[in-house]
């Protein structure tokens, strides 16, 4: 069968699983980034003109949004991602972001998910990076897939029977915009778009 477009086939797709503390970026149309989020935040950034994008995955060490040391950790996660995109040819003024996660998963983590979500939104606002979509909070884990070349994102809410990676606050990171599609875990059908546009 001859393909009539230039989209990569399933056999060409490379899926990279992005774990807590990681930051990745690519300009490849064959690359897909995947992660599972509870209280953690992932930021999907893309320069749609340059065709480059990346994802980070982090959890602030506490729910104290005034703790300067903890906020530096979150800022470092964001700066790593931005710098990775710039090295691939992105222009900072064109970078767009989508943010996901920040759920309240366990009583032990308390309001840390809410604090992570608040940090991410504030950081983007303060840095002048346009947030084109976000899905934050709640009490369910999320599975995210991100196509860095185009900025396309898929989100699926997970059920209680799904295994969510153990999230632990940490101080160190590992290693140096298209459509958003939402899916329901139980019927795998596309959901009405619940994206909240930033105010």
Swiss-Prot record:
Pfam families: CheD
Documented EC number(s): 3.5.1.44
Domain of life: Bacteria
Keyword annotations: Chemotaxis, Hydrolase
One Gene Ontology term from the biological process aspect of the record: chemotaxis
GO molecular function, one term: protein-glutamine glutaminase activity
CDD domains found in the cross-reference section: CheD
Enzyme class: hydrolase
SUPFAM superfamilies to which the protein is assigned, alphabetical: CNF1/YfiH-like putative cysteine hydrolases
Reaction it catalyzes: L-glutaminyl-[protein] + H2O = L-glutamyl-[protein] + NH4(+)
Family (UniProt): Belongs to the CheD family.
Record's function text: Probably deamidates glutamine residues to glutamate on methyl-accepting chemotaxis receptors (MCPs), playing an important role in chemotaxis.
Identification of the protein by name: Probable chemoreceptor glutamine deamidase CheD
Organism: Cereibacter sphaeroides (strain ATCC 17029 / ATH 2.4.9)
Gene, per the UniProt record: cheD
